[in-house]
Swiss-Prot record:
Taxonomy, superkingdom: Bacteria
Record's catalysed reaction(s): 5-amino-1-(5-phospho-D-ribosyl)imidazole-4-carboxylate + L-aspartate + ATP = (2S)-2-[5-amino-1-(5-phospho-beta-D-ribosyl)imidazole-4-carboxamido]succinate + ADP + phosphate + 2 H(+)
GO molecular function terms noted in the UniProt entry: ATP binding; phosphoribosylaminoimidazolesuccinocarboxamide synthase activity
CDD domains per the UniProt record, alphabetical: SAICAR_synt_PurC (cd01415)
Name of the protein: Phosphoribosylaminoimidazole-succinocarboxamide synthase
Cellular component, GO annotation: cytosol
Species in which this protein is naturally found: Erwinia tasmaniensis (strain DSM 17950 / CFBP 7177 / CIP 109463 / NCPPB 4357 / Et1/99)
Amino acid sequence: MQKKAELYRGKAKTVYSTENPDLLVLEFRNDTSALDGERIEQFDRKGMINNKFNHFIMTKLQEAGIPTQMEALLSDNEALVKNLDMVPVECVIRNRAAGSLVKRLGVEEGMILNPPLFDLFLKDDAKHDPMVNESYCETFGWVSQTHLARMRELTYRANEVLSKLFADAGLILVDFKLEFGLFKGEVVLGDEFSPDGARLWDKDTLNKMDKDRYRQSLGGLIEAYEEVANRLGVKLD
């Protein structure tokens, strides 16, 4: 499947059309951003790692009965995916307190959240992805109540699958975000799942193994991503 016109260029991925209107090419670049895109750097191998990591995770989720946009790996940094009508709201699950939750509520980082928290954020970098709720989604017409309920259900199901997957690899799934879209009327998981959009800590040391290494200038970003991938059994080379 050959990519054609560039449709969208995000902070770390580019989307291309194909000869099939139902399919797109998702290209993972080496770009890494923080502060809603204000800080951007390039890291060798990052696009390849995230592409293969995402394919691995999406395959695991599909095997668990969660519909995803993934069709096939095309190359080291490209994947063939379904063309979704994306919902402008992202779902976040928090198993432990970290990031904006700690800043907002003043709770201790690492606090276990039982049951896990479910948050919604409007996808808008210019407005710094403001937190919203179900009422906002209905009033502004971002997503129907039925589709939002399905998104919530699939997000919690993904959390069950992935928490065990990472725990078996000696990692804590602290939190993560998921984006969904509609494909022929069905809610389908889109975008990506990688250490760019999840917080992953080593179970024993609590070392951060995700993009917080870049956000907090800890160093060793690619080494951490590669270690997570290797622990899970993702074939990188």
